[in-house]
């Protein structure tokens, strides 16, 4: 299920939040793994074409850290971010802080990702809570949804491949 207005939804329920929802044709435990295992995260969390992820470190426990660094191969540009896990409720919910190395919005954000499965379809709901309306507005103007659409489309392909090969 590649991008369509029905499969990828973005909303702003408050002046400090962005909520992104997407359905995946895969069981929840597999989608959870794709969000939490570095060898799977590297295959899809890349944004637009031309980016790689040379650093993907995940210490999946409360108080554990994660670190991602992306590289745009054509320019050599790096973009890094990291945070700390506040809640890990396998396979239902992740809560973690988020801060970019070169912050393009003020402050730190808190990401809450919820995984809900119904009939073999897993809905992922990411709620990003920013420190201020200014930070939220900066994020909404950034075009971040384009990179997320590309990444989530890639994730759908990774999940389909794992199911097809029985590799999960």
Question: What is each stretch, according to the model?
Answer:
Residues 17, 95-149:
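Beta-strand/loop substructures that line and gate deep hydrophobic ligand-binding cavities in soluble
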Residues 1-3, 131-168:
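A conserved amphipathic terminal alpha-helix motif
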Residues 28, 59-61, 86-93, 114-123:
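A short, structured loop/turn motif at beta-sheet edges
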Residues 1-51:
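Hydrophobic ligand-binding cavity/cleft-lining segments
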Residues 22, 55-58, 81-87, 98, ...:
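Hydrophobic/aromatic beta-strand elements that line small-molecule binding cavities or substrate pockets
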Residues 8, 19, 39-78, 166-168:
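Short beta-edge strand/loop motif at the mouth of beta-sheet-based domains
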Residues 15-21, 53, 65, 80, ...:
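Intrinsic-disorder/low-complexity, polar/charged segments enriched in Ser/Thr/Lys/Arg/Asp/Glu/Gln
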Residues 31, 41, 66, 85, ...:
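Hydrophobic pocket/interface hotspot
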